Amino acid sequence: MANNNIMGIDFGTHFACVGIFKNERIEICPNQQGNRTTPSVVSFVGDDKLVGDEAKAQMDRNPLNTIYDVKRLLGRKTTDELFDHEVKKLSFKVTTYEDNNEKIEFQVNYKSNVVTLTPIEIATSILEQIKHTAETFIGGESIKKAVISVPTDFTEKQRNDLKEAATAAGITVVRMIHEHSAVALAYGYDQVKECSETTNESKESNVMVFDLGGSGVSASMIRVRSKLFEMIGNVSDHTVSGEHFDHVLVQHFTQEFNRKYRCDLTDNARSKAKLKSACEKAKRNLSNMTQAALEIDSLYDGRDFFTNITRARFEDMASGLIKGSINAVSQLLEKCNMTKEQVDKVLLVGGASRIPSVQNQLLNFFDNRQDILERSMNQEEVVAHGTTIQATILAADKSNQSLTCNSSNISMGAPFSAKFTPVTIGIQDSNGNLIPIIPSSSLIPCKRTFTLNTSSENQDNLNMAVYQGSAPLAKDNQLVSRFIFKSSPNPIDVTFEIDNNNTLLIKSEQANYSIKF
């Protein structure tokens, strides 16, 4: 297949990852240091701007001029509910625009000057580095297009800011897909292939994506049947994340150090950054070992800090976070009106999903069904793998070719559809709000059924206005069409379905409509 140079990018909170179709298979591109993920970090040192691994190395020694976690602040305003909470955890200076105190800027020392930079500019630097990584991997050939994954709860503003950053980095975003859709695609592609080769029957399964990553915990339910992927619900909670597990360790060791040396290291940005980095490493080690050591030279005022912690102690301190992460699972089941027995597989995503107690609690929740947790996927790479599959399919579409997949590679063959809805499709409620029916980045084909009720007695007709967009108020979105139903003493069930031809089918007992997008 001709290389149409569409890469798949996972722009993560802590790390970014990029994949490309090469040698008849999906490949995750290693960076200059040989690592398959690149830290989402930018550091300014004298006259140099460092990105990725080199920048992350500066977090301990140059914390005031090293920007990280930019994904959390992309598309945000200072008036957002979580802004103050997020900023308190950062070591660098966050300011606001002179002419707009709701807009966020970062202040650093660069080339002997005080420089202000926006979240978009920092994201641009990271995406430029990712683009360079992919281009180097394929021998220096230019790559100008990408599929980029976004969280399920990313707002339209956040999407637009990420797209603007990509454009500034020389990347055309041909599609944005939900991170969980990418995970399902990475997992389900082989399942679909296996099913289609072994039987003509339509095998249906309910797959839950459990994502405990740097920015929060989220869970999605995706129904898989033959070549149909249908996202039927998702929940997210930003009060529980891998970062919060790190913070548990940071608090614990800060108190231990302060007790031991009778001082307060929290007034020193460099000391806090060094401790945070060591705690991140300890958390990762505790997923594989029952005890982890911290060895930090000259942590504060020339004092070394050598200590350790057991996995049992860590999991006890983090028990509230672990319980909170499992709550997302029960909330998702309630939202989808499903029982835990109806879930066939749980896909684990995000570094913190490796914590043994998290996995044990998930197993307990699902009555110790040993085969329910899918542990074979690489949690750090699976989203990029899924976005790259989507990118490869789009490249094949442009070449009038199709794709199939086996356990090791992707090649031309029988067709497989993996398109996604570009925008949310919803209806207006009686208060003028948009009620999403089919979320953006839902895998196509997909369908949803909902109920219309009369809002008052003696109502002759039911009016339904259909919009596309993600703005909370319906009027701020694009009107698709208006429909009128005759009032009925019983609720009216309406089904929205988007087929492989991007046609919206609206079905009810009274009438059927079709709208081509």
Swiss-Prot record:
InterPro entries: ATPase_NBD, HSP70_peptide-bd_sf, Hsp_70_fam
Species whose genome carries this gene: Dictyostelium discoideum
Transferase found in the keyword field: no
PANTHER family registered for this protein in UniProt: HEAT SHOCK PROTEIN 70KDA (PTHR19375)
Gene Ontology, cellular component aspect: cytoplasm; phagocytic vesicle
Protein name: Heat shock 70-related protein 5
Domain of life: Eukaryota
CDD domains named in the record: ASKHA_NBD_HSP70_HSPA1-like
GO function term, MF aspect, one: heat shock protein binding
Keyword line: ATP-binding, Chaperone, Nucleotide-binding
Pfam families in the record: HSP70 (PF00012)
Known role: May function in protein folding and assembly, and disassembly of protein complexes.
Keyword Ubl conjugation appears in the UniProt entry: no
Protein family per UniProt: Belongs to the heat shock protein 70 family.
